[in-house]
Amino acid sequence: MAVEDDVSLIRTTTLVAPTRPTITVPHRPPAIETAAYFFGGGDGLSLSPGPLSFVSSLFVDNFPDVLTPDNQRTTSFTHLLTSPMFFPPQSSAHTGFIQPRQQSQPQPQRPDTFPHHMPPSTSVAVHGRQSLDVSQVDQRARNHYNNPGNNNNNRSYNVVNVDKPADDGYNWRKYGQKPIKGCEYPRSYYKCTHVNCPVKKKVERSSDGQITQIIYKGQHDHERPQNRRGGGGRDSTEVGGAGQMMESSDDSGYRKDHDDDDDDDEDDEDLPASKIRRIDGVSTTHRTVTEPKIIVQTKSEVDLLDDGYRWRKYGQKVVKGNPHPRSYYKCTTPNCTVRKHVERASTDAKAVITTYEGKHNHDVPAARNGTAAATAAAVGPSDHHRMRSMSGNNMQQHMSFGNNNNTGQSPVLLRLKEEKITI
């Protein structure tokens, strides 16, 4: 009997299944009602004050009492999020890309819109400091722009025209220039503007633009002009940092004569030191030096005549219209500036023309052999002293040159002319 009761109890327990719990899903409201449910509008037409309102559903509205701007107590987290502390009043929106300047400046807040955690006096002080800083920056920028001393566009610079030769009293016209290796400034070529005046000069400058050398070629056949052409005409005269400078600005006559430039360059070594004007400082002095130029023409089979002095050949060049080149020599005695060039006549191949320039500052060196001694004795110190004492233009003098037995070296003509060079 007891066993049957146990079996029936087990059978009853096995057959009865437990009841499952059920979940009831509430009715889903429309979209407008859902927005009203979340944002608390009630009528479904209010907008969200911000994305932080969604967070309010995650917290329990049991915060301590908080004072709202209208001095009302609230314990709602939503009220805390929508308070002016998180959402200060926004300025009206402006259309367009550029806004007026006064609208971009910060505006002080009204006392009723101050966050409850900041006193109104503090907020006014902050906005006032910002406005003061902006106005100070604007005023400094305006003063810097209007002040000529700070404006880079109004800076004055001392401009020195480096293409003007030093004034020597004559009027010059530039007719060409040539670049120089290792120098930024080219060599300039000038000629006297006086009618039929053959004088030319070359001006060289250093790397800093200062005039270092002026070489004159020829002799002026006129006096210095009295009425100098001023800046009112086409010729300009200006006073610069390196002294008074003058140059003709006649661009129509600016030309490049390659033949003249080549001749001038190759004649540099042929010029005596007295013809070269070197400028070491700002101020220069002008003095006239009388430099004799002796031309000897003789019949000879050799080009270099034995006149008792020792010479060293330093170059030669081709002469136009002459098949024979011109050779250049300089005296080998130290500190002696005498030079000569030797060439044959274009019409007579046996005629040797020797041109001496300068004065020897020493005696005739000792003769190396008898022939040289006889030649030195014939042309010796007495003749050279006589040459140095002669003056005047286009003077001709016959002299005994060399050994009388050697008829091949008897000179036929000696021309001595005086040159006045301003240095």
UniProtKB/Swiss-Prot annotation:
SUPFAM superfamilies: WRKY DNA-binding domain (SSF118290). It comes from the Eukaryota. It is found in: Nucleus. GO terms for molecular function: DNA-binding transcription factor activity; sequence-specific DNA binding. Disulfide bonds: none annotated. The keyword Transcription regulation applies. PROSITE patterns: WRKY. Transcription factor. Interacts specifically with the W box (5'-(T)TGAC[CT]-3'), a frequently occurring elicitor-responsive cis-acting element. This is Probable WRKY transcription factor 58. It comes from Arabidopsis thaliana. The gene is WRKY58.
